[in-house]
Amino acid sequence: ILTTTYWGSQGILYMHNCKGEELWSRELRCNGAVITPVNWDGSGQDLVLLSASTEHGGLMDGEGDIVVPFPDDGHPELCCEVLDITGDEREEIVVWDLKSLWVYTQDRAKSKSDKTYLPIKYPHYNASNYRGEFCFPRWIES
């Protein structure tokens, strides 16, 4: 369970196990974090989108480490969202501001398997800027 709070500072993250015991905490340097689960590579190991910031954002693993940073390529950093745009069950990161919209996707082909990782997530029709996210593991026959 990953939560964010603004008590004392903006964007403090807490990771808890299923019993509510704190595993770790991090204080981010960015103003807020979307903490959205991401099925980035289809492996069943979900990552968490923090923000589109090249300095403080990226995709974080369950240990709190940034494992997929955003490149310093001039992309917008104002807003970001997680969507499966290409239809291969892996999710893309959409980043935008008032002038442009960019899409980041994986640089590798989807691996062939008898099962496909397709987690149960928050429905897009309920999307809001103030929402709680969930992600329950689910494997389906390919």
Where are these regions (language model features)?
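Beta-propeller-forming repeat regions
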Residues: 1-142
